Structure formats: structure tokens, C-alpha cells
């Protein structure tokens, strides 16, 4: 299937997994005289995933392989800003895969410019969200570059056909037909899809989960952490200041040991279909709960309602791959303004799969025990409520009278 399109040099987003292992030789065979450069994004997927990846890329057809450490930038410039908005997609998904795509696309474009490439290539399938996320970022950052999406071109249609393709060319791979789950990992989370999970009536087996302890097997005693928050950002745990990345790693370790952060959801993909995924986001779940605790104290009713609107809009923006847009900048600016008052400390309790903000305080707290008390009250005249209620319910009263 020789391509008629002329491409001189292409940068491939390379993971070393089955799909991208096939893409390198496929490009070599189907694009004449095209130099292939592999780009590997280290977003915290783990040392095991990266071990030997440069040698593997070169052996599979790449002329060069760039491994770029993006872990700190991912947490500081993508995860922390998203946390500040409060974004949670469809009320459950903490956007682990979605947040990583724009930084990977951005770094891929930077490598392309560095090596003088005229094309970009990704290994996303034609059924998923990631093809849209990557290509939307490419369009915003490098509209002049050609984009190659092999899954929308080639005649390889299954995992088995990819394995056969590599076997015919004596290209080694750790993948096998029995490794049935599709997984995506970074510093924030790991996702699991495929296999028996494709039937939502099937309960996830124990082998699905890889990052967190089964809540049943978690410690029988709870663990407590004190989370410090400054302007909507977590700055310290138990009084120890850490970088955003190190904070996340610490909370991942602590929360995973208690089985915190597991979700099993059916989500609406951008391409129109529903998909089922199991996600593990231990540290992130603790962070979201801690920030929610501060938010409850410091934002008044109408401001919090607006914050929830920002959160919902931003969750769809990130999920849909629209990071490099004016809307993203606007929503981040709004979240930054709202976060000015989000300062304080929260004590969270982790126990057998759950995390709760059980104590909270803030110098900007709007909570007044004097006004809220059910005991003796000298600051609030309860008789004042009568006039408010009559005005508040006036439209209902008028409608009822008019219908008589």
C-alpha cells in the first residue's frame, strides 16, 4: 500500500507498545525515502515501560529516538491547573489520559521543528478520542505539518494482525494475544479497557487493577493526612513542602495502599459511542477531595455555582482535546480568580477505598459558627426569615392565585 503523498521526515509519537511497534516498519515500507524519528514522552508511565525503548525504536526502523522527560511539566502546567478548575468529566472521570495528550502533542511538535520534519504521526485508532485530541493540538500548534494516522489507512484490523505483521518481519515484541487489556499510564493514573470489560455486565476481575490495593485487603486502620492549600494548589502534605510532581507521587503511594481512587465507568466518547473503562487515580482522588473541602468553606453559594459551571465546561474541554484554545485560557483565568480565596488546611481520612475530608480550616472561611449554631443564638434574628420567604416565594404565590 504505497502512499502517493511525499513525506521527507516524520516524527512518530512512540510508546514501544504493539501499535507503534508496527507503525515504524509500516511507515518505512509505505513512504519512500522517508526518514522516521521516534519521540517518546516520559509522562510518568514507569521505568519498566521505558526500559530499552530507544534501542527498540532504532531496531524497528527509526533513525533517531528522543526520550523527553515531561513529568514535572505535566503535573505543574496541566494537572494542577485542571485541579484548580475542579474538572471531573461526567462526574466521575478525573481526566488522566485526556490531560496528558496536549503536553505530548506539544512536545512532539517541538521535536518536529527541531529535526526539520514535515510530518507528524500518531498511533491512535479511528474509534477513539485520542486521534481527535492529538490532531486538534497539531492543528493549533503546527497547522503546516502533515498528519499521518495509520489506523485510518492500513488494512491491519486486529491485535492478532499486528502481531502477525511483526512476526513476519522478525521484530520482537512483548505483546501477545493473551494480553487482553489496553492500558494507558502516567503520573496521574492508569486506565484499563478491553477484554471482558467490553461487556458492562462483567465485573472487573482482580487482574484488571494494577496500581491500587483491593479495598478489601487494605489496612484495617485508617490513615490521616494533612493537606495544605495555597490559592487552590496543594503545597504540602503533613507540613512537608514538596514539588507538585513529588506531592502527587507521595499521595499516589499513600492512597494506593488504602485502595483509594478506583472507578469503573461507562463514558460518552467524543466520537459518539460509549466505552467502558476502569481507572485508578489514587493521589488525584485525594487531591480532589482536599480541594473540595476548602472550596466548601470559602466560596459563597452563587460563586460556587459558577465554579461548578467552570468545572463542567473545562472537563469537556480537556476531554475533547481543546487545550490550546482561547476558551481554555479563559476558563483557566476564571478558575485562577476563584482560587485566590482557596487557602487553608484539610485533614483527609483514607480507609478501605474511600477518602473523606473530615477536618478543614481556612483564613478565608465564610463559615460562622455563631450564625450556623443550633444552640443559643444572639447574632441572628430568626424572625427576619419571614419577610425573605414571602418575597422568595412570591412568584409561586402569584401563579397559584392566578390559576384559581
Swiss-Prot record:
Pfam families: Arginosuc_syn_C, Arginosuc_synth. GO terms for biological process: argininosuccinate metabolic process; L-arginine biosynthetic process; urea cycle. It is an enzyme of class 6 (ligase). This is Argininosuccinate synthase. It is found in: Cytoplasm. GO terms for molecular function: argininosuccinate synthase activity; ATP binding. One of its GO terms (cellular component) is cytoplasm. L-aspartate binds at residues 125, 129-130. PANTHER family: ARGININOSUCCINATE SYNTHASE. ATP binds at residues 13-21, 41, 123. It comes from Moritella profunda.
Amino acid at each position: 500500500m504505497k502512499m502517493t503523498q511525499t513525506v521527507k521526515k516524520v516524527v512518530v509519537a512512540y510508546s514501544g507498545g504493539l501499535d507503534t511497534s508496527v507503525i515504524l516498519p509500516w511507515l518505512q515500507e509505505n513512504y519512500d525515502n522517508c526518514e522516521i524519528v521516534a519521540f517518546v514522552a516520559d509522562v510518568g508511565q514507569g521505568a519498566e515501560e521505558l526500559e530499552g525503548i530507544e534501542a527498540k525504536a532504532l531496531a524497528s526502523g527509526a533513525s533517531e529516538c528522543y526520550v523527553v522527560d515531561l513529568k514535572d511539566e505535566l503535573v505543574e502546567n496541566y494537572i494542577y491547573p485542571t485541579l484548580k478548575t475542579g474538572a471531573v468529566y461526567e462526574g466521575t472521570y478525573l481526566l488522566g489520559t485526556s490531560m496528558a495528550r496536549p503536553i505530548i502533542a506539544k512536545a512532539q511538535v517541538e521535536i518536529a521543528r527541531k529535526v526539520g520534519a514535515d510530518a507528524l504521526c500518531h498511533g491512535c485508532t479511528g474509534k477513539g478520542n485520542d486521534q481527535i485530541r492529538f490532531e486538534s493540538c497539531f492543528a493549533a500548534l503546527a497547522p503546516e505539518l502533515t498528519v499521518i494516522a495509520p489506523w485510518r489507512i492500513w488494512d491491519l484490523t486486529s491485535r492478532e494482525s499486528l502481531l502477525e505483521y511483526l512476526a513476519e518481519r522478525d521484530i520482537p515484541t512483548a505483546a501477545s494475544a493473551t494480553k487482553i487489556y489496553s492500558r494507558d499510564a502516567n503520573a496521574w493514573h492508569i486506565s484499563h479497557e478491553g477484554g471482558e470489560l467490553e461487556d458492562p455486565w462483567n465485573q472487573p476481575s482482580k487482574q484488571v487493577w494494577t496500581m491500587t490495593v483491593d479495598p478489601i485487603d487494605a489496612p484495617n486502620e485508617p490513615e490521616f493526612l494533612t493537606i495544605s492549600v495555597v490559592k487552590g494548589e496543594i503545597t504540602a502534605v503533613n507540613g512537608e513542602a514538596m514539588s507538585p510532581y513529588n506531592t502527587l507521587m507521595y499521595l499516589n503511594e499513600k492512597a494506593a495502599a488504602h485502595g483509594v481512587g478506583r472507578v469503573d465507568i461507562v463514558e460518552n466518547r467524543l466520537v459518539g459511542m460509549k466505552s467502558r473503562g476502569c481507572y485508578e487515580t489514587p493521589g488525584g482522588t485525594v487531591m480532589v477531595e482536599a480541594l473540595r473541602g476548602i472550596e466548601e468553606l470559602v466560596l459563597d453559594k452563587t460563586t460556587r455555582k459558577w465554579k461548578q459551571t467552570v468545572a463542567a465546561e473545562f472537563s469537556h474541554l480537556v476531554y475533547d482535546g481543546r487545550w490550546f484554545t482561547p476558551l481554555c485560557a479563559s476558563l483557566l483565568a476564571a478558575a485562577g480568580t476563584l482560587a485566590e480565596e482557596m487557602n487553608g488546611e484539610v485533614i483527609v481520612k483514607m480507609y478501605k477505598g474511600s477518602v473523606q475530608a473530615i477536618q478543614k480550616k481556612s483564613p478565608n472561611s465564610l463559615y460562622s459558627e455563631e450564625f450556623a449554631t443550633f444552640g443559643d443564638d444572639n447574632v441572628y434574628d430568626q424572625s427576619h426569615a419571614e419577610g425573605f420567604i414571602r418575597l422568595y416565594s412570591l412568584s409561586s404565590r402569584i401563579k397559584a392565585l392566578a390559576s384559581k
